[in-house]
């Protein structure tokens, strides 16, 4: 009941979050994170199907492989984005700009496909860069690295490589920003809202069950991201 109301997502609520979100008046995670995670999850599923059918290609640029990690983080996109928000308090507009950067990056590097091996590194890198572009005050790279579960040196390299691969084209004007906001709104309008709400409910149920059955003594066996205490 109460949970259902709090998880209901609509284009109007999303737009309200994007343009008038206030940390002082609202401690909840911005809706844009749920919408963006839904989009990325769908992209991952589509790319996985494509990679199964496609022949191995040598056309993919070797430089983008810097985003590949040896171990896939044991954390959903929703949880990872939620973690970044929780510890950095990056505003909703930062995630929209990061979305713009990811889209530009994929267009500039057509051989690159978002996958489970690179998506987490791509997200923390683009969100950090977007935060520097959008917000007046920012955390150091070392802090973003800690939040994202990376070494500072690795995140520094990812940032630099990303900037060069993008040709340092970071400017996002108002019309571009608005168009991406509209795209996120359409994601909610065309049935995405229900899927996001359903996913959030499932995540809450899983989290509740885990809290009941987990032995606190075994928390140190979780993936490195869960071991970082800030």
From Swiss-Prot:
It comes from the Eukaryota. GO terms for molecular function: protein kinase binding. Transmembrane segments: none annotated. The keyword Cell cycle applies. GO terms for biological process: cell division. InterPro entries: Cyclin-like_sf, Cyclin_P/U, Cyclin_PHO80-like. Expressed in roots and stems. Expressed in the shoot apex, leaf primordia and young leaves. Pfam families: Cyclin. Keywords: Cell cycle, Cell division, Cyclin. Interacts with CDKA-1. PANTHER family: CYCLIN-U2-2 (PTHR15615:SF85), PTHR15615. Belongs to the cyclin family. Cyclin U/P subfamily. This is Cyclin-U2-2.
């Amino acid at each position: 009941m109460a949970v259902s109301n709090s998880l209901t997502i609509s284009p109007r609520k999303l737009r309200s979050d994007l343009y008038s979100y206030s940390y002082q008046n609202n401690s909840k995670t911005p809706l844009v994170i749920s919408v963006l995670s839904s989009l990325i999850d769908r992209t991952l599923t589509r790319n996985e199907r494509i990679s199964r059918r496609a022949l191995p290609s040598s056309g993919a640029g070797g430089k983008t492989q810097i985003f590949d990690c040896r171990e896939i983080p044991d954390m959903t996109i929703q949880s990872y984005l939620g973690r970044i928000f929780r510890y950095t308090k990056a505003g909703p507009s930062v995630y929209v700009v990061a979305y713009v950067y990811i889209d530009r990056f994929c267009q500039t590097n057509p051989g690159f496909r978002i996958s489970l091996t690179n998506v987490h590194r791509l997200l923390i890198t683009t969100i950090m860069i977007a935060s520097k572009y959008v917000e007046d005050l920012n955390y150091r790279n070392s802090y973003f690295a800690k939040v994202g579960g990376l070494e500072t040196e690795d995140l520094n390299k990812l940032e630099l490589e990303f900037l060069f691969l993008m040709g340092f084209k970071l400017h996002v004007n108002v019309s571009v920003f608005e168009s991406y906001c509209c795209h996120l709104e359409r994601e909610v309008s065309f049935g995405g809202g229900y899927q996001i709400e359903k996913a959030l409910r499932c995540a809450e149920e899983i989290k509740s069950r885990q809290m009941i059955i987990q032995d606190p003594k075994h928390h140190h066996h979780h993936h490195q991201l869960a071991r970082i205490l800030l």
